[in-house]
Each structure stands twice: as structure tokens, then as C-alpha cells.
């Protein structure tokens, strides 16, 4: 689709100042698995970094070390994470991708996130 067409263009045009961020929460993989996502981006000519998308220190390290040399490859950050992490009723449950909490659920969410 359009993502892979864009990935191809980014590498072919040598857009070294381009950085894509993939919210890799595995929700789409349940419907259409992608084998070796890192290898797929590499095959398009991108520099790939994989981090724990829940780790503030890994995110800060990635962005502070990011080099936007226009003569280098474009970069992609695969941020592995779990949808709804940190809340018992939402963590890993795909329905929360589009669901609105009712009042009771909202109170549970606020309590578990210390809000």
C-alpha cells in the first residue's frame, strides 16, 4: 500500500533527513501478520531502530542520537508497545482501539493511571 510506496520513495530519493515512527502495537498483525517488520524496512533501504515504546529513556536516547545527515539513509523507529498498557481493562484488548469508556470504566482508567 501507500506506506511501502512511501518507504520506497524515501530511500530512492536518499531522504536522510526523514524519520518515520511506527507505533508497533501488534493490533494490525492480528488481522494481517507482517513477518520480520524490521527486515522489510531494511529491504527498502532504511536504517532501522527497534525500541520498547513504553521506555522513556529509550525514546529519549533514540531522538537525542538521531542524525539527520541528508546524505544518509532515511530512518525508521519501530516502537514496540502494548495498546492500552497500564490499565487492566484496556491492556492488550483490541476493542479499546475504538471504544469509548462508560463512566464506570473511565473511573477505573483514571484510578489505575493515578489521574
Feature locations, PLM:
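Glycine-rich ThDP/TPP pyrophosphate-binding loop and its adjacent helix/strand module
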Residues: 1-115
Amino acid at each position: 500500500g501507500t506506506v511501502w510506496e512511501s518507504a520506497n520513495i524515501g530511500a530512492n530519493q536518499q531522504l536522510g533527513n526523514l524519520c518515520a515512527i511506527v507505533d508497533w502495537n501488534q493490533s494490525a498483525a492480528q488481522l494481517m501478520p507482517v513477518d520480520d517488520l524490521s527486515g522489510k524496512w531494511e529491504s527498502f533501504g532504511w536504517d532501522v531502530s527497534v525500541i520498547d515504546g513504553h521506555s522513556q529513556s529509550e525514546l529519549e536516547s533514540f531522538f537525542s542520537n538521531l542524525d539527520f545527515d541528508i546524505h544518509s539513509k532515511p530512518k525508521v523507529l519501530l516502537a514496540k508497545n502494548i495498546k492500552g498498557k497500564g490499565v487492566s481493562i484496556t491492556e492488550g484488548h483490541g476493542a479499546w482501539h475504538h471504544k469509548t469508556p462508560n463512566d464506570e470504566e473511565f473511573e477505573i482508567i483514571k484510578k489505575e493511571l493515578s489521574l
